[in-house]
Swiss-Prot record:
Belongs to the eIF-3 subunit M family. Residues 227-391 form the PCI domain. One of its GO terms (molecular function) is translation initiation factor activity. The keyword Cell cycle does not apply. This is Eukaryotic translation initiation factor 3 subunit M.
Amino acid sequence: MSAADLVTVLAEGTFEEQIVEVSAFLSRSQPEASRNDFISKFQQLALDAEPAEPAEPAVSTEATEPASAPDAAKKQQTVQQLVSEIVTLGEGSDRELEGVYNLIFSLISSTDQQTQLVPQLLSAVSKDSAAAATGAGGADKSNVRYRILSNLFNSLEATSALRLQTFNALLSLVAANDDLDYLTSALTALPQWLAQWSVSETEKASCLESVAKALEGAEKEHGQTSKAYQFLVLHLRYISTLPASASTKEAAERTVAAALRLPRLYEFEDLLHVQAVLDLKSASSPIFDLLKIFVGGTTADFSAFASSHSSEFQRLNLSHDDLLHKIRLLDLADLCALRVSADVSYASIAKTLNIEHDQVELWVIDVIRAGLVSGKLSQVNDAFRVYKSTHRQFGKEQWQSLEQRLVQWQNSISSIIESIAATRGGKLPDGAPVAAELATA
């Protein structure tokens, strides 16, 4: 699928020739004895709609009758009748199928009935796709179905609501065949397309939800859910602009649960900026309290929640053990964030995580692997030297801590400059005046 506004499908030949070509393709599904009659019927309809130009004689002695003018209404009726005969993908090589459908797109675009005809075409192209993909009923035609729908999508106007219908049909096909990689570039462009398409906000939200569900289903099989989560959040932001409903609450709970399940996601504060998530608080949804714990709570808070809301874990398909492990890692990261460029004793870590002393190093290794902390273990000193640590949220306390560290660095620099000046008899080294000004600023 192309991100371009419009890809024009060119069709050669007269209207009659185009109709005959498509009808000949469709006649393959007819009994052999009636195929010629089928083609002749549509050829006559095409001639009635757009009479052929009379051939010029070699020597003209008298004026010839001019051809009748094309009848737009009859042309449209002919195309409508032709499209009504398309009930399945059809028979032919992939190249032939793609070419014929491009011609059909061209014929449809010449009418003002795209809104009625395109859905018929989508149904025909998608019909029996699952059976074909599994080898039942003939060769697998999945790839050519994808290309046909992609070509149709690209032939439609950038703002056309039919693009959404075409995208949904293609999404259903690739999801059924576990071929979502085919839509990688399309999913990247989807937010931009949604802004262009002339469809309602509800339809946009429904599209995002369909994408998220398709990705969830596919990624569960492969142990990945990060891309699905991105679309869950995008969907949630869309429906946050709509009137609240039971489905909004359900979507918010599903999104928060998906975030908590992600094994390498540790930052949850952004979810608290989504209105649908904030509405969970007024709806007294326990998962909002759980989210708040992972944003700024402790292992003790989590244990208290788990003891009073044990049924929530099963309802939301959450693993208590996985979440306990995650909140402990966050607790350890918080502890380390208070001691950047300093040592954290094994005893402090054991107390914070409520673990045995001999388990400390394993937890430190885990938090480093999670990307939350970097540092160096010292078995000699029974301490962990912290180089850097991430914060779950950056609020007033974190700003105050940063200010204190900057003041400490400022004082250290001033002290170093004064020491150098003293050893030089009061003369500052080159560049020191600037440093001194910074130190006293």
